Amino acid sequence: MLSPEILEYYERGGERERLTAGAGRLEFLRTWDVLTRTLPPAPARVLDVGGATGVYARPLAEAGHRVHVIDPVPEHVAAAGALDGVTAEVGDARDLPERDASADAALLLGPLYHLPDRADRVAAWREAARVVRPGGVVVGAVISRFASLIDGVAKGYFAEPGFVSIVDRALGDGVHRNDGSVRQWFTSAYFHHPDEPAAEALEAGLTGVRTVAVEGPVWMTGPRLTEFLADPRLTGVMLDMLRRIEDEPSVLGASGHLLTIARRHA
C-alpha cells in the first residue's frame, strides 16, 4: 500500500515526535482547533484514516467520540489500538473496510499527501464520502506546494545540491521524491497547490467544500514561534489571529499545511 521509502520512514518513527514542538506543535493546535469547530458533537463515530499512532485519535476519544483508526502501517495500528477508547486496523484509504454511511465523520489527515496520482486521491475522498452518513463531514489534510521551498530556506537544506532538484520538481508537478538516502528530509509525497484539494473533493461528489490554512505564514518564524508556544497567553492570541485569517486566499500558499472540509450530500 505504501512505497518502500515511505514505509521505512514511518517504521523508523519519522513522525513520532513531529507534532510536539515548534511548527509541528502549531500544526497540531491549529488542526485540533479546526476539528473542534467542524466535527459533530460527541459521541460521534469518527474514522481516522491514516491516523498513524493516534495523535488526534487520543484527544478525540478523550472528548467522548468513538474513534476507529485505519492505517497502512502495522506498527501504527498497534500503537493506536492500545489507546483508551480507540480501535484500529490495517487498511487503505482508497478501499476502506467500512460499511456505507457507518460513521458520522471521516478524517484524511495522512493519506492524501502520499498519493501522487490524482485518481488515487479522488478515490480516497470518494471512499471517505461513502462511509459517512448523509450530511456527515470529511476533513482532509494536505501539504502546500511551496512547503519544501520555505522549509529548505528555514533549515538550510538548499546548501545540499540534491535538495535543489527535489524542490524544483515539487514546484513543477507537486511530486516530492526522496528515495530515503537523506533522512532529515521528508519522505516521498505529493504537495498540493492550494486550489487542488477542494477540486478533488468536489470531483468525489462532496459538497460545501472549503479550504483553510493551518499554520499560515507563522510556521516560518523559528525561535520566536517557540517563545509564543511557551506562553499560554501568547499561544491563545496567535491561535485567535490565525483563526481570523484561515479562509484568506492570499495566505493559503504560505501555509505549510491546508485542511479541506466537506460534507456528504444530505
Which positions does each model-derived feature cover?
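Conserved class I S-adenosyl-L-methionine
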Residues: 1-42, 55, 59, 79, 137-170
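Acceptor-substrate binding/catalytic loop of class I
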Residues: 115, 181-195
